Regions:
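Conserved NTP-handling cores and scaffolds of large molecular machines
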Residues: 107, 206, 227, 231, ...
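A short linear hydrophobic-aromatic micro-motif
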Residues: 126, 174, 254-259, 290-295
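ABC transporter nucleotide-binding domain
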Residues: 176-271
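C-terminal coupling/interaction segments
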Residues: 272-320
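Non-catalytic surface loops within mature trypsin-like serine protease
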Residues: 31, 129, 237-239, 270-272, ...
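ABC transporter nucleotide-binding domains
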Residues: 4-9, 14-210, 215-216
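ABC-family P-loop ATPase nucleotide-binding domain
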Residues: 1-13, 311-320
């Protein structure tokens, strides 16, 4: 029986002289899953992807792609992987159509099948307007889409993409995210990104890497739940903030903090991410507060990311 685990990274290490870029990391990506690989610059994301795709050797550990050892059988692995490298490199003097034709030739397609593969890739990433233009004349966003087209041309089982929406405008980002969501149904997808909203939009799981180590691996909502403002309640009053409101809120044993904004609203932060919306709405009703809107905040991924990567960086510096 074929396993659902399509990417298996086991105790992977990469050293450059005395510098450790990847430090004994392990994770799996299953069929039908999109894993977002997050981390600050220099964290080890791109190095890990280069090793997984067989473009760089490891210093230790191993990578299995659909059960195949990537180090022992690099060509076999590359046949079943679609890879969008950092910066989406391509031959600048080639036109979009000739470059994709070149990729199709490398992949072994000929005749009608080759033509159809190229057409499908162009249609999926909306490259029709630039197919006869040299790649070096294209905008950063179009170059990225050319790179994405070559990665999906052969309809791979596994997709590995380094910053797939880098340089795209909001509409293009939306289109690419929709495409990734559609493809994720029958593929294993690994993307690296520094765009935290992307994790929330398209990823089933998020892994945060810093200093070459994975410090979080879980669902985006689990990451969001680590935010100090997870389950916080924001109240906007119709006229002004009632004088007694802060006092009444602070005495609640589930409330950690109450902050008033310049715009006349309150942000009520719960202790330990507890859900407090029912208590707040009951109090608002009892006190007859004149409320324009009230809502619960899910939390902010950026503050969680900043907190845990900074803590790890500071701990690392103390040990150097």
């Amino acid at each position: 029986m074929t396993s659902d685990v399509k990417i298996s990274v086991q105790n992977l290490c990469k050293h450059f002289s005395t510098f450790t870029a990847v430090d004994n990391i392990s994770f799996d990506v299953n069929k039908g899953e999109v894993l977002g690989f997050l981390g600050p610059n220099g964290a080890g994301k791109s190095t890990t992807m280069k090793i997984i795709t067989g473009y760089m050797s490891s210093s230790g550990g191993r990578v299995l792609i659909d059960g195949i050892d990537a180090q022992k059988h690099p060509l076999l692995v590359k046949k079943i992987i679609g890879y969008l490298p950092e910066g989406a490199p391509a031959y600048g003097d080639m036109t979009t159509i000739s470059f994709l034709g070149f990729i199709a030739d490398i992949r072994g397609y000929k005749g009608t099948q080759k033509k159809q593969k190229i057409i499908d890739a162009i249609d999926k990433v909306n490259l029709g307007s630039v197919i006869h233009k040299p790649i070096e004349t294209l905008s950063k966003g179009f170059k990225r889409r050319v790179g994405l087209a070559q990665a999906i041309l052969h309809d791979p089982l596994i997709l590995i993409m380094d910053e797939p929406t880098d340089g795209l405008d909001p509409n293009q980002k939306y289109e690419v995210r929709q495409l990734i969501n559609e493809m994720a149904k029958d593929k294993a997808i690994l993307i690296s990104t520094h765009i935290l909203e992307e994790v929330d939009a398209i990823c089933d799981r998020a892994a945060i890497i810093t200093q070459g180590k994975i410090i979080f691996d879980g669902k985006p909502e689990e990451l969001q739940a680590m935010s100090p403002t997870h389950n916080a309640v924001r109240i906007k009053f119709t006229t002004h903030v009632p004088h007694s409101s802060k006092e009444r809120l602070f005495v609640m044993d589930t409330v950690s903090d109450v902050v008033e904004s310049e715009t006349g609203s309150l942000l009520i932060t719960p202790k330990n991410g507890t859900s407090i919306i029912r208590q707040i709405t009951r109090l608002a009703h009892d006190e007859a507060w004149d409320i324009e809107e009230i809502f619960v905040t899910a939390g902010h991924l950026d503050e969680v990311f900043r907190t845990i990567t900074t803590q790890t960086h500071n701990a690392y510096r103390q040990n150097v």
